């Protein structure tokens, strides 16, 4: 058995289940689940039609590389969304479809980490737990970059010691962030690209929340966009991960892509020829339609905007909470230990949220998730509003 498996910590939702074990939630309150970031808005109507229309593809093995039509659709979306130079992306060299970004983010570390020398993988803290597991099982050590109120919910890259950069082989970014919703600006991204060149590491930017934002005239900056603005139109050392799960409310379809540096994409394709699972032909067909349509994405943003406006207005009366730059999470402070608050919210009010400390690690003398909860505004607006009122009631109880 791989001894590195012993380094993995229980997944946050496993810990949440243990926290609630043996507790019977009050039945006079309807259950409201805001713990998991699973979109609940209605998927685009045309997706089911495309899936059904292409079921004949079940008779064929799909290629690891995916169809040229899908890669072209992804190319067109990237050019449009991030205003990239027209000829900067070749669908044959720069793009690789994947079955959702979860497995791709994990597999990527296995592909690029050189086990022959000491390796650090830098990542935000709190963080999407796949980053840590990927680093550990690739034989590397995670190095956590705390995101706190003092750093506006972003990693403070200026405090990273020179010796850490020298051992860095991979930097995971998450922008917009999970759970803070903070967006990394162009200057910072371009500085990190320079660091990647100077210290010889790869940047893996998880941008799965990039299409959930509030200002239609100011969408979040992407890594490839920042690279192109800096003249790095070959996207050297830059890889981005995108998904239809959040953008198009299709978490069950498992469709995303990896794009960027052609040399790295070529190596990742070779790796995935052995390890990865090819995307089903009917999923590819539906994905082409999804990447080609923006109307449903705009409607998605409108629905989240409504929920954020209503919920932040309610919670701000009793909690320290702010509207994030983007994503569908709130990250408020709690008056007591976050696990205690989460347990009592379920026990007394039948509302599920996630303790912030379950998403973070003790690092540099603090746990940045302590006394925070992550609220995923994925439920219908009526449930989100009701949950906000219940959260306020519990908050007031603890403040007495």
Where are these regions (language model features)?
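PLP-dependent class I/II
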Residues: 2-12, 22-52, 69, 79, ...
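A short, structured active-site edge motif that brings together acidic residues
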Residues: 61-67
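Glycine-rich loop-to-alpha-helix module at the N-terminal edge of alpha/beta enzyme cores
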Residues: 34, 58-61, 73-76
């Amino acid at each position: 058995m791989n001894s590195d498996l012993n380094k993995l910590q229980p997944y946050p939702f496993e810990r949440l289940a243990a926290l609630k074990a043996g507790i019977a939630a009050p039945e006079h309150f309807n259950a409201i689940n805001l713990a998991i970031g699973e979109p609940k808005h209605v998927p685009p109507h045309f997706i089911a039609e495309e899936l059904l229309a292409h079921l004949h593809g079940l008779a064929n093995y799909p290629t690891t590389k995916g169809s040229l039509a899908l890669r072209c659709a992804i190319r067109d979306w990237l050019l449009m969304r991030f205003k990239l130079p027209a000829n900067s992306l070749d669908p044959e060299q720069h793009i690789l479809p994947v079955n959702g970004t979860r497995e791709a983010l994990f597999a990527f570390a296995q592909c690029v980490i050189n086990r022959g020398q000491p390796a650090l993988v830098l990542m935000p803290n709190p963080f999407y737990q796949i980053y840590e597991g990927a680093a550990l099982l690739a034989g590397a050590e995670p190095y956590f970059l705390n995101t706190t109120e003092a750093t506006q919910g972003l990693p403070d890259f200026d405090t990273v010691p020179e010796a850490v950069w020298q051992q860095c082989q991979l930097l995971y970014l998450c922008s917009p962030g999970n759970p803070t919703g903070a967006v990394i600006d162009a200057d910072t991204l371009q500085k990190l690209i320079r660091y990647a060149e100077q210290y010889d590491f790869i940047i893996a930017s998880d941008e799965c929340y990039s299409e959930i934002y509030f200002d239609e005239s100011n969408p979040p900056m992407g890594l490839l966009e920042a690279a192109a603005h800096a003249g790095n139109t070959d996207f050297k050392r830059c890889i981005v991960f995108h998904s239809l799960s959040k953008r198009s409310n299709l978490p069950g379809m498992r469709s995303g892509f990896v794009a960027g540096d052609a040399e790295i994409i070529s190596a990742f394709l070779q790796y995935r020829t052995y390890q990865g699972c090819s995307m089903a032909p009917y999923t590819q067909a539906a994905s082409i339609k999804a990447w080609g349509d923006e109307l449903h994405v705009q409607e998605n943003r409108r629905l989240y905007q409504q929920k954020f406006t209503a919920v932040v207005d309610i919670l701000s009366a009793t909690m320290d909470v702010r509207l994030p730059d983007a994503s569908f999470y709130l990250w408020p402070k709690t008056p007591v230990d976050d696990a205690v608050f989460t347990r009592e919210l379920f026990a007394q009010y039948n509302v599920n949220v996630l303790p912030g400390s379950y998403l973070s690690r003790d690092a540099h003398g603090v746990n940045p998730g302590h006394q925070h909860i992550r609220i995923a505004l994925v439920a219908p607006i009526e449930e989100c509003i009701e949950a906000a009122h219940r959260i306020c009631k519990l908050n007031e109880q603890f403040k007495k």
